[in-house]
Amino acid sequence: MDKTTFQNPDIVKFINEKFYAVKLDSERKTDITTPEKVYKYVKGVGKERGYHEMAAALTMGRLITLPSTVFLDETFRVLQPIPGYKNPETFEMIMTFYGDNHYKRTLFTLYQKSYVPLEQLKLKLISE
């Protein structure tokens, strides 16, 4: 996603305007301290890979799929972990659902039906 989705200028602009973007290595070996807790690296057993407790907490204890994107609200409550690669078109729809607070008013399945890509919105504004 670093080479595709996160190179899209519309996505970069929207993320910078609406979110605090943080990249976390799910296998980071150093502690991360928050006011509530110290998150640590958990070593894998045998051939299993280790993981960081913060990555597990953010994905709500689910198996960590790489890459994963997690959206949090203003109070740092996990709204939704999004597992796996998302192309720019799909990611844009997901990020605007959360970034413009549509999740507070509608289900994602309904939002998908009425979604207008940012590029189309820009063209509409230019033509008006």
What are these regions (language model features)?
Residues 9-80, 88, 93-100:
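Thioredoxin-like thiol-disulfide oxidoreductase module
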